Regions:
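Class I Rossmann-like S-adenosyl-L-methionine
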Residues: 1-136
């Protein structure tokens, strides 16, 4: 993977966190996240395919694994979002590494139990979260 210059990574890190926060606000108002992303991409034609892929993957991963990452509310949003992203995409993005570097190794877990163990290690949870926590 090509690694962009540090100033580009910093800009992407700031942008991705802002997009995620806007998506959270959108969902808290009772609106679907896919409509938010659609509106975002229409407003910002300058976002290329890589930007759109990063934003979409991060936002959907965040909401997919929210039941687990919310078990560590003291952690910053960036750390919880990066952990959720890494559950789906073990090869992280440089912008996410800048926002929330992980001490533990990232490996693709094949089972839900394996993913729960990874989340526990990344977020500092005493035990792996139960699968039932994923269902609202």
């Amino acid at each position: 993977m090509h690694v962009p210059p540090d100033h580009v990574i910093s800009t992407q890190a700031t942008a991705v966190l802002a997009v995620l926060q806007q998506a959270i606000d959108h969902v808290q108002q009772g609106r679907p996240v896919d409509s938010f992303l659609q509106q975002l991409y229409r407003r910002h034609r300058e976002y290329g395919s890589r930007d759109r892929r990063l934003y979409s993957n991060l936002v959907y991963s965040f909401f997919r694994w929210k039941g687990w990452t919310d078990l560590a509310p003291a952690l910053p949003l960036a750390a919880r979002a990066a952990a959720a992203y890494r559950l789906d995409f073990p090869e992280s993005h440089p912008a996410l590494d800048k926002l929330a570097p992980l001490d533990a190794p990232v490996q693709q877990a094949a089972t839900l139990a394996g993913k729960a163990e990874q989340v526990a290690s990344w977020l500092g949870l005493p035990t792996p979260p139960p699968a039932a926590a994923l269902v609202p």
